[in-house]
């Protein structure tokens, strides 16, 4: 997850999903890693394009991008879109 302190939708994600994320099946399959938009881009993500929209959720497998969700559409739609990304990962 690419985030920044001044992002109201990052806070909304935290309020609506953040606490339960790691306890869900999807959260276990795609652990949430937080990267600050203004911070240094992690070395192991150098091959992944940075995003300027926060929050952005990038699903990475073996150093390759599977897909990304740009923005936070709300709790229910977030889970649906994340599941589509996980299904895409499974089909590769």
Where do the language-model regions lie?
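Short pre-active-site segment immediately N-terminal to redox-active cysteine/selenocysteine motifs
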Residues: 3-9, 53
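Typically the conserved alpha-helix immediately C-terminal to a functionally engaged Cys/Sec
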Residues: 10-26
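Extracellular/periplasmic catalytic domains that process cell-envelope and extracellular macromolecules
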Residues: 26-27, 49-53
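Short amphipathic alpha-helix with an adjacent loop that forms part of the alpha/beta core around
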Residues: 42-49
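Thiol-/selenol-based redox modules, centered on thioredoxin-like
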Residues: 73-92
